[in-house]
UniProtKB/Swiss-Prot annotation:
EC number(s) stated in the UniProt entry for this protein: 3.1.-.-
Domain of life (superkingdom): Bacteria
InterPro entries (UniProt xref): MetalPrtase_cat_dom_sf_prd, YbeY, YbeY_CS
Binding annotation for Zn(2+): H128, H132, H138
Cofactor field: Zn(2+)
Name of the protein: Endoribonuclease YbeY
Subcellular localization: Cytoplasm
Cofactor note (record): Binds 1 zinc ion.
Species this chain originates from: Zymomonas mobilis subsp. mobilis (strain ATCC 31821 / ZM4 / CP4)
Chain's role: Single strand-specific metallo-endoribonuclease involved in late-stage 70S ribosome quality control and in maturation of the 3' terminus of the 16S rRNA.
Length: 176
């Protein structure tokens, strides 16, 4: 079972149910991954999603990734992929997957540039972030292809169009 703890800044428009969107995006990402066993009621899994601002994400990006700019989404896994695989053998395990932090202005700008709703774009960003928490990455082209395919699959199940239809697979990924 996946529990999402959402912290939502006042910047984020109130007309959207960001907490429900985060819950859905996280569950979909887990459901298409090799860690889909975490959806079973025997597992207590928590993901923290922070709907934040550019300044906060900029500071985190500089501190943890040595990139002096805000980005759309950051993920901070609490465990290595190997540790996550071990949990499968321990029914009744509790697992804090990690934190996902979103920058409102970057996400809004990207959604406008792509001509898509902020909600669809944020669903994609949270899906992407959740896959990072599950050990997926896009450093190498083959990794990027696997991760993007999982994102497409999760989003298609939510009737969200392919977010990568306008580019080639690349190492930089969403959170570049």
């Amino acid at each position: 079972m996946i529990t999402v703890e959402a912290d939502i800044s006042d910047l984020w428009p109130e007309q959207s149910n960001w907490e429900a969107l985060a819950q859905t995006a996280c569950q979909q990402a887990v459901s298409v991954s090799a860690s889909d066993f975490l959806l079973a009621k025997d597992y207590e899994t928590e993901i923290s999603v922070c709907f934040s601002d550019n300044d906060t994400v900029h500071a985190l990006n500089k501190t943890w990734r040595d990139k002096d700019r805000p980005t759309n989404v950051l993920s901070f896994p609490m465990m290595e992929a190997e540790e996550l695989a071990e949990i499968k053998n321990r029914v009744g395990s509790e697992c804090l997957l990690g934190d996902i932090i979103l920058a409102f202005d970057v996400a809004k700008k990207e959604a406008l540039e792509k001509g898509i709703s902020l909600e669809n774009h944020v669903t994609h960003l949270i899906t992407h972030g959740t896959l990072h928490l599950l050990g997926y990455d896009h450093i190498l082209d083959n990794e990027a292809e696997i991760m993007e395919d999982l994102e497409r699959k999760a989003l298609a199940q939510l009737d969200i169009p392919d977010p990568y239809s306008d580019h080639e697979t690349g190492k930089e990924g969403l959170d570049g």
